[in-house]
């Protein structure tokens, strides 16, 4: 399902690219990634994987990372808005769009609405990847498929506790709610246990605190020896995880891909924004990036600059419809 990547970018091309970027105030030899969740989560993996590819492919000399958990990504977002750090980008995904929806829908009371930040408060640089939703159970679980989970839930709704790597109303929660709704259950009755990123959610599953996890497929690729993937939200099986069954093939037509991308602080120059966006696009043509992409089963979805803004506006409408469908707003 993935396009074959192009020939390796020559060292000469990379040198020319770095030279062109160095003419901006963006320091092309380094980049700092702010991550709004804990270790082992989708944001964490996307930031570190992108930084790894950029350095190994020669686009950067160094990449540094800072996990700033809190408020479902809100703490990191506020940090970017209030401090406006240089040479720093924020990794974000669909939850940032959800913030925009909650600000304008009355989901947050009027007194606190002004405190709700969204993608409009930072500078969209580029969307880079898509990650399908995935549901997993422990290896020793009686659940071998999503149908098994649905049957257990219908027999006793409280017996199935679903973990996720963020707060209620986050993508992990919404994708899980969507899958249960497709199975004929009331999504608001599902017991959802929030954790600080996918790593802790996985620990909760393995300890028996929860029965299933709703998360991104990429977050599970490194833990496949510990868990059983019982359903993913892709339209077809994914080449990088061929043993993972889709919900669709099990009779539940739930399809969703969670985008992830990068944002700059308010006031970032247009020149810097375009330079970083170009770099994020060019690295996707390298074998270093392909190695990172394949091990995470990501989909390349490159939307730079204005295309990214257009995409965010469109998804705001789509996510508003989804949240209304699920009764969240």
Predicted feature locations:
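Bacterial N-terminal signal peptides that target proteins for export
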Residues: 1-12
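C-terminal segment of classical bacterial N-terminal signal peptides
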Residues: 16-25
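N-terminal (or domain-start) structured segment
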Residues: 26-121, 168, 183-214, 219, ...
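An extracytoplasmic/periplasmic, membrane-proximal ligand-sensing/linker region
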Residues: 28, 270-329
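Hinge/capping helix and adjacent helix->loop/strand transition within the periplasmic-binding protein
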Residues: 28-30, 55-57, 79-88, 101-200, ...
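Short coil/turn segments
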Residues: 38-40, 94-95, 138-143, 165-170, ...
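Hydrophobic/aromatic residues within well-ordered alpha-helical segments
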Residues: 46, 50, 171-175, 312-315
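C-terminal lobe and pocket-closing loops
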Residues: 126, 215-285, 296, 314-317
């Amino acid at each position: 399902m993935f396009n074959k990547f192009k020939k390796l970018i020559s060292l000469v091309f990379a040198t020319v690219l770095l030279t062109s970027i160095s003419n901006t105030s963006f320091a092309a030899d380094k980049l700092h990634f702010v991550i709004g969740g804990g270790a082992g989560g989708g944001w964490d993996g996307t930031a570190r994987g992108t930084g790894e590819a950029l350095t190994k492919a020669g686009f950067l000399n160094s990449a540094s990372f800072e996990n700033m958990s809190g408020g479902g990504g809100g703490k990191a977002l506020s940090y970017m808005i209030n401090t406006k750090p240089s040479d720093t980008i924020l990794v974000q995904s669909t939850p940032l769009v959800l913030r925009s929806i909650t600000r304008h829908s009355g989901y947050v009371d009027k007194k606190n609405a002004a405190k709700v930040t969204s993608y409009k408060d930072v500078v969209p640089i580029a969307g880079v990847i898509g990650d399908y939703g995935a549901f997993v159970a422990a290896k020793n679980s009686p659940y071998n498929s999503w149908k098994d989970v649905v049957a257990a839930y219908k027999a006793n709704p409280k017996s199935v506790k679903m973990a996720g790597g963020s707060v209620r109303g986050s993508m992990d929660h919404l994708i899980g709610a969507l899958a249960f709704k497709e199975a004929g259950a009331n999504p608001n009755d599902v017991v959802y246990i929030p954790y600080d990123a996918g790593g802790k959610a996985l620990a909760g599953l393995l300890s028996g605190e929860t029965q299933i996890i709703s998360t991104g497929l990429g977050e599970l690729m490194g833990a496949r020896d510990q868990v059983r993937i019982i359903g993913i939200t892709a339209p077809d099986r994914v080449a990088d995880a061929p043993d993972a069954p889709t919900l669709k093939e099990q009779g539940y037509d739930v399809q969703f891909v969670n985008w992830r991308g990068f944002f700059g602080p308010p006031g970032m120059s247009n020149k810097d924004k375009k330079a970083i966006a170009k770099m994020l696009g060019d690295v996707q043509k390298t074998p270093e990036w392909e190695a990172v992409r394949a091990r995470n089963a990501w989909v390349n979805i490159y939307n730079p600059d204005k295309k990214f803004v257009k995409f965010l506006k469109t998804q705001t409408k789509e996510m508003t419809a989804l949240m209304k469908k699920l009764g969240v707003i």
